[in-house]
Regions:
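Glycine-rich, often proline-containing surface loops adjacent to acidic residues and nearby aromatics
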Residues: 116-124, 157, 163-164, 168-170, ...
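Short amphipathic alpha-helices and their capping/turn segments at secondary-structure boundaries
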Residues: 18-22, 80-96, 136-153, 237-242, ...
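Active-site beta-loop-alpha junctions enriched in small/polar residues
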Residues: 103-107, 159-163, 209-213, 231, ...
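Alpha/beta catalytic barrel-like cores
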Residues: 1-127, 217-224, 247, 278, ...
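Well-ordered, non-membrane alpha-helical segments in soluble/globular domains
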Residues: 14-18, 76-85, 130-137, 183-194, ...
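Active-site groove signature of glycoside hydrolases
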Residues: 99-104, 148-162, 287-292
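Catalytic-face loop-and-helix region of soluble metabolic enzyme cores
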Residues: 224-325
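Active-site loop segments of alpha/beta catalytic cores
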Residues: 133, 137-233
């Protein structure tokens, strides 16, 4: 089974981190985030770095739409360009599969604000403009990367940790006294479809570490993979429908909130087999899945982050045999 990383890593050395990811996750190399470098290297900062014709800046209240970019916004773009240069150098014109990750429109909406300070959730027109800009930026980036690295197959991971809160009306306003209205499912689907369309022929998955996961909406939007934490899955019927429809399941088998606690390989395999039993499906259906940590590892020590990645890889190498045995 393919194994990969899912988000952030500790430290500030992108070239070294990429080399480690390419060695460990050779079937699907993730371009990690290194938030220790500064605000522009965080998840929201990386997403702002691909926005087209929408300047942003970063102030005391966080990221916001602006008349012109500031140092933080320029740093975000600079980090992304540097990261992609490092990726090209590490790959050295080899065939590879690489996964890029960007915050999706619902999560970007909670982390990007209007000039007056409210979230862009308060302005449907602004949200649509940001989503269109994000999709155009991702599209342009993929086209550029295909020219630069023609032997690479690209996968996009759209991070939506805030999707459950946005869809349930749980996001607080600037004052904290109220909540933004719940977003209609049809609106979320339309926003996601815009981003998925911008990804062209690349495989596009959603990563959602919140609950409940919007399985049906994600499928309608065109996502082909859902990355989530295995042990926190709530609606198993939805999960079964997802995998039986032919969509892929990205199984976060390491609880990354348990910082620096590296589980045994057998423990990770047991979590996959547990999921098979709970779903009551043919174990072979999950062989197309992907193993990963549940979320990012930025809060971990470098040693343990590297070790947990190697553990996930070893579990991926062994779990198919266990699934075959479970099918007999």
């Amino acid at each position: 089974m393919i194994a990969t990383g899912i988000g952030s890593l500790p430290g500030t050395d992108m070239r070294g981190s990429l080399a480690a990811m390419a060695e460990t996750f050779d079937q699907l190399i993730p371009l990690p985030e290194l938030p220790a470098r500064g605000v522009g290297a965080h998840m929201i900062g990386r997403a702002t770095a691909v926005l087209v014709d929408l300047p942003v800046d970063h102030g005391p209240g966080g990221w916001r739409l602006a008349d012109s970019t500031d140092h933080a916004a320029r740093s975000a773009r600079s980090w992304l360009r540097s990261d992609l240069d490092d990726l090209e150098e590490v790959l050295a014109d080899k065939e590879a599969s690489v996964k890029l990750s960007f915050a999706g429109p619902l999560t970007l909406a909670t982390g990007l604000h209007l000039r007056a300070g409210e979230s862009i959730l308060a302005d449907g027109s602004a949200l649509a403009d940001v989503t269109t800009s994000l999709a155009e930026g991702v599209s342009q980036l993929i086209a550029e990367l295909r020219r630069r690295m023609p032997r690479v197959t690209w996968t996009l991971q759209i991070d939506e940790p805030s999707a459950p809160a946005v869809l349930s009306g749980a996001v607080p306003t600037q004052s904290g006294l109220y909540r933004y209205p719940a977003m209609a499912g049809s609106t979320a689907v339309q926003l996601w479809q815009t981003v998925v369309s911008g990804c062209g022929e690349a495989e596009v998955g959603m990563h959602c570490c919140g609950a409940p996961i919007p399985w049906a909406l994600a499928r309608r939007a065109g996502f082909s993979t859902m990355w989530c934490e295995v042990t926190s899955l709530l609606n198993l019927d939805r999960v079964a429908e997802w995998v039986e429809s032919g969509a892929r399941l990205g199984m976060g088998v390491v609880d990354t909130m348990q910082v620096d606690k590296v589980p045994l390989v057998d423990r990770l395999i047991d979590r996959v087999l547990w999921l098979v039993r709970r779903l009551e499906i043919d174990p072979a259906v999950l062989k197309s899945g992907i193993l990963s940590p549940a979320c990012g590892l930025a809060g971990w020590s470098r040693h343990d982050a590297a070790e947990v990645c190697r553990t996930v890889k070893r579990a991926g190498d062994l779990v198919d045999e266990q699934l075959d045995q479970a099918s007999r």
